């Protein structure tokens, strides 16, 4: 064929001849420029992911020869190359210093680097040795978003969630908390009833010999409950139907007995609210089989009025509250952008009419109906309103309520009631039949009332405490590890009181794991942007320690989370939520 076609040359079948000429050319130019001759490995160094034409020094290493017909652009920016670049830095053979020295393509304000342009194999071989290919460096790591304090604080934020279990661990023994004497137990109960504030020393050398410490420990375990049935678990109430199966409940099928129990419960509930209103009770919980309500006195959680937080809720419950005239807000639900824009425009025009918190006034309903009419007015203008089937009012209502239904039984469904509306909520809960289960293991059982102070019809109960000593393995052998377990309905004041005692008894060093009742974690949602005006001066007779009142008066900081871990080291706290 070469004889028939003089211009035809089969040189493409011999790439070694081309490379030999290229190397000869490189040597000649290198001798002129005073640089080292070309080495086959330079191509792969300048173009990552490009295999050499000949094995060269890599011969015998099992490296496959590069396809000479491969597209260089696909080779440089191939998916395989991109995956190789995304490998963590620790897996790259390139030193960390060299990678850090190169300009990062993720730095703000710097132009994005352009990949080198190669039009042929010669351009790759004879390209500018100073040209650096596109190297993807690691993007700067974002700061950690964990809810953790900057190393150490003299106190920790208030946690309004109910706890079911606390586990304290320390290198110091907890034996002082075991086997309280009868006199110490009685003294602790009296101190609780009289709201005696105990001031312990900074550090106690012999905790087991400190009668004052042991009495204060008994005082911190006391709480009040209604109703009280020793054979029935009254907390938690959500999700415990399986544990209550088979329990004797004579009221479940006796309506007259149910009426007596509910009437006594209503009196106890009203008594608690009156104490709260008089600031003789700081807060209390109402635990039903579907939701939990936290009532707080004015001056707590950064609010200067009485507040009530309810979670979780459903659309049906919220609608029933609206029908009763209860004004409430949903702090974790973002306002509709269109409504927010209308409100901002109204405010800019000088409309200072206060907006009701429930967002469902009569004017809103009228505007919604007018919007529906306007949305179908264009059909009448075209004269086809009779030919096109319009959605009925029920479909429109369901479409609008679709977003509300999505919130049911979720933390975002939390409801906040303020001021005098809390009294309306009280009457609503007393008269609402749905707060008592009609069937199942909890049928006929009224909601559980939990309070840090005594009230009408309440029963005094104490949390259960148990200390355990274990051996933990360390490098040199075994080390004694001491733990203290607290179980029961643990309220915020008990958590703070116990940490104050352990701070002195354990010489400023311990760690704790908290187990929260999940539906109540959302009670830590901030409800007021500013600190309360009425603080501890008006709550000095509420039955809590002054430092506990000071902590509970602070604005909520945990959001919809709760404390999971608390550590005290050298009398300074760190925590995680």
Curated annotation (Swiss-Prot):
Acidic residues bias spans: 362-375
InterPro entries named in the record: Donson
Gene: donson
UniProt-annotated location(s): Nucleus
GO biological process, alphabetically ordered: cell division; DNA damage checkpoint signaling; DNA replication; mitotic DNA replication checkpoint signaling; mitotic G2 DNA damage checkpoint signaling; replication fork processing
PANTHER family in alphabetical order: DOWNSTREAM NEIGHBOR OF SON, PROTEIN DOWNSTREAM NEIGHBOR OF SON
Protein name: Protein downstream neighbor of son homolog
Protein function: Replisome component that maintains genome stability by protecting stalled or damaged replication forks. After the induction of replication stress, required for the stabilization of stalled replication forks, the efficient activation of the intra-S-phase and G/2M cell-cycle checkpoints and the maintenance of genome stability.
GO cellular component term, pick one: replication fork
Oligomeric and partner information: Component of the replisome complex.
Predominant location: nucleus
Stretch list, region Disordered: 1-67, 328-382
Keywords: Cell cycle, Cell division, Developmental protein, Nucleus
Family recorded in the similarity comment: Belongs to the DONSON family.
Species for this entry: Xenopus tropicalis
Top-rank taxon, per record: Eukaryota
């Amino acid at each position: 064929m070469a004889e028939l076609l003089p211009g035809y040359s089969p040189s493409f079948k011999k790439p070694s001849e081309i490379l030999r000429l290229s190397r000869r050319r490189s040597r000649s130019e290198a001798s002129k420029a005073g640089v080292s001759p070309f080495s086959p490995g330079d191509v792969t160094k300048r173009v990552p992911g490009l295999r050499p034409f000949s094995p060269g020094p890599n011969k015998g290493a099992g490296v496959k020869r590069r396809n000479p017909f491969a597209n260089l652009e696909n080779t440089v920016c191939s998916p395989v190359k991109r995956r190789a670049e995304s490998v963590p830095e620790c897996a790259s053979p390139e030193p960390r210093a060299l990678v850090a020295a190169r300009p990062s393509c993720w730095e703000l304000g710097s132009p994005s680097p352009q990949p080198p342009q190669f039009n042929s194999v010669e351009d790759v071989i004879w390209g500018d040795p100073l040209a650096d290919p596109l190297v993807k460096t690691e993007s700067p790591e974002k700061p950690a978003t964990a809810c953790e304090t900057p190393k150490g604080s003299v106190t920790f934020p208030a946690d309004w969630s109910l706890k079911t279990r606390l586990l304290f661990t320390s290198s110091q023994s907890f034996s002082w908390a075991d086997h309280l004497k009868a006199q110490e137990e009685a003294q602790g109960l009296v101190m609780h009833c009289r709201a005696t504030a105990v001031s312990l020393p900074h550090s106690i050398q012999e905790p087991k010999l400190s009668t004052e410490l042991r009495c204060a420990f008994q005082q911190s375990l006391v709480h009040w409950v209604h109703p009280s049935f020793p054979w029935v678990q009254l907390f938690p109430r959500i999700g415990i139907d399986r544990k209550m199966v088979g329990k004797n409940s004579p009221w479940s099928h006796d309506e007259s007995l149910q009426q007596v129990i509910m009437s006594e419960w209503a009196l106890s509930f009203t008594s608690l609210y009156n104490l709260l209103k008089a600031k003789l009770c700081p807060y209390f919980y109402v635990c039903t089989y579907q939701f939990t309500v936290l009532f707080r006195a004015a001056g707590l959680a950064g609010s200067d009025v009485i507040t009530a937080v309810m979670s979780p809720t459903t659309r049906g419950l919220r609608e029933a509250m609206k029908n009763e005239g209860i004004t409430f807000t949903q702090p974790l639900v973002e306002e509709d952008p269109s409504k927010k824009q209308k409100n901002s425009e109204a405010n800019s025009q000088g409309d200072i009419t206060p907006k009701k918190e429930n967002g469902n006034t009569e004017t809103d309903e009228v505007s919604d109906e007018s919007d529906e009419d306007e949305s179908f007015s264009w059909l009448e203008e075209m004269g086809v309103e009779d030919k096109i089937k319009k959605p009925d009012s029920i479909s429109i209502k369901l479409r609008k309520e679709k977003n509300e239904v999505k919130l049911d039984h979720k933390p975002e469904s939390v409801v906040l009631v303020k001021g005098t509306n809390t009294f309306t909520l009280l009457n609503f809960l007393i008269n609402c039949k749905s707060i008592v289960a009609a069937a199942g293991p909890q049928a006929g059982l009224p909601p559980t009332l939990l309070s840090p102070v005594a009230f009408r019809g309440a029963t005094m109960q104490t949390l259960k405490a148990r200390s355990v000593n274990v051996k933990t393995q360390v490098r040199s052998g075994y080390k004694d590890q001491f733990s203290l377990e607290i179980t029961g309905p643990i309220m915020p004041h008990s958590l703070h009181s116990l940490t104050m005692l352990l701070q002195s008894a354990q010489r400023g060093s311990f760690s704790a794991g908290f187990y929260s009742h999940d539906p109540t974690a959302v009670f830590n949602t901030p409800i007021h942007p500013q600190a309360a005006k009425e603080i501890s001066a008006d709550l000095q007779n509420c039955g809590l320690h002054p430092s506990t009142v000071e902590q509970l008066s602070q604005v909520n900081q945990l959001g919809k989370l709760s404390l999971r871990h608390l550590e005290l080291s050298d009398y300074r706290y760190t925590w995680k939520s």
